[in-house]
C-alpha cells in the first residue's frame, strides 16, 4: 500500500518533514528501517546528546503501525535553524542480539515452542508463532557464547524454518517458518 508523506507519523523522533523512508525485511535477520528528515535545530541538538540507548521509534499512519523498533544509529547535521536526522532502526528482536550467553536445555522432550518460550520469557510481552509442526528437540540443546537471537535462529534452522521478526509490533514478535498466505 502506498502512503503520502502527510499520512506518515513518527514517534520517538520529532521529524518535521520526512524526506526518505525505507523498510527492509529478510528471513533470519532483524527487520530494518531507515529514515531521513528535518527537525527543528534545538530538537536535533537534544537528540544528539540526550537520546538514551535502546530508544524506541514507531512509524505509523493514523490507524496502522508500519514499523516499530529500536534506534540503532542516529546522525544529526544542520544549520542554525534546521537540523537533518538520519535514523536506522531495527525491530525489537535486536534486543535479543545484545548479550552472549552460555546455558543448556537438557529436557529432550521439550518442544521447540517450549524452548522459545523459555528464551522469550526474559523479554516482556514477547511471543512466537510457529508455521511448522511443534516437535520435541530430541537431544540436549546447548547455547554457547551465542545471543538469544543467534541461538533460536540456529535451533529453528535445524527444522529448516527461518526466524523472522514482525516489524509492525511494539514488542518482540517472532515467526518461525514460512507463513501460509490466503489468495
Located regions from the model:
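Edge/loop elements at the starts and ends of beta-strands within beta-rich repeat scaffolds
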Residues: 26, 81-82, 125-126, 169-170
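Second-shell loop/turn segments in exported
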Residues: 100-109, 138-142
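Short beta-strand-centered interaction patches in the first periplasmic/extracellular domains
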Residues: 73-75, 84-85, 91-93, 132-183
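Glycine-rich, acidic and aromatic/proline-enriched surface loops and short helix-turn segments
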Residues: 92, 109-129
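Long, intrinsically disordered, low-complexity accessory segments associated with secretion
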Residues: 99-102, 112, 116-117, 148-151, ...
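Assembly/oligomerization scaffold segments
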Residues: 1-102, 158
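Short secondary-structure capping/junction motifs at helix and strand boundaries
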Residues: 68-69, 125-128, 162-164
Amino acid at each position: 500500500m502506498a502512503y503520502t508523506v502527510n499520512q506518515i507519523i513518527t514517534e520517538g523522533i520529532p521529524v518535521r518533514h520526512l524526506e526518505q523512508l525505507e523498510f527492509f525485511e529478510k528471513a533470519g535477520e532483524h527487520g530494518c528501517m531507515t529514515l531521513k528528515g528535518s527537525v527543528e535545530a534545538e530538537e536535533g541538538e537534544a537528540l544528539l546528546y540526550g537520546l538514551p540507548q535502546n530508544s524506541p521509534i514507531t512509524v505509523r499512519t493514523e490507524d496502522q503501525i508500519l514499523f516499530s523498533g529500536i534506534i540503532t544509529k542516529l546522525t544529526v547535521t544542520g544549520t542554525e535553524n534546521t537540523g537533518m536526522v538520519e535514523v536506522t532502526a531495527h525491530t525489537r528482536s535486536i534486543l535479543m542480539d545484545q548479550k552472549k550467553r552460555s546455558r543448556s536445555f537438557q529436557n529432550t522432550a521439550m518442544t521447540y515452542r517450549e524452548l522459545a518460550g523459555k528464551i522469550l520469557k526474559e523479554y516482556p510481552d514477547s511471543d512466537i508463532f510457529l508455521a511448522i509442526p511443534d516437535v520435541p528437540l530430541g537431544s540436549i540443546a546447548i547455547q554457547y557464547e551465542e545471543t538469544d537471537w543467534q541461538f533460536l535462529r540456529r535451533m529453528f534452522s535445524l527444522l529448516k524454518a527461518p526466524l523472522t521478526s514482525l516489524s509492525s509490533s511494539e514488542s518482540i514478535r517472532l515467526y518461525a517458518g514460512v507463513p501460509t498466505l490466503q489468495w
